[in-house]
Amino acid sequence: AQINALMDTVTWRYEQPEGTTSTFAHAFLGRFYLATGHSACVSPENFNADLGMKYAREQAEGKARDKLWELEGYALAKSLWVLPS
């Protein structure tokens, strides 16, 4: 539930470099960068900006979710550690 709540607050920035068939989706939690997804097609004739954004975001969402699990897991582990004195 915590990861889903965090994912609901992720903001997205998109890039489509001019002259390419590449699209990038960048995920941010506040000002903290989480992940980037990328999509591209071989043929410029087949390039569709909307599909590029969709596929790049899908990839970035998976990476962002994985990063949040990693960070939340670390935060939990750190809160449970007892340092030897």
Locate the predicted segments by residue:
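Domain-level marker for long, solvent-exposed, non-transmembrane regions
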Residues: 1-85
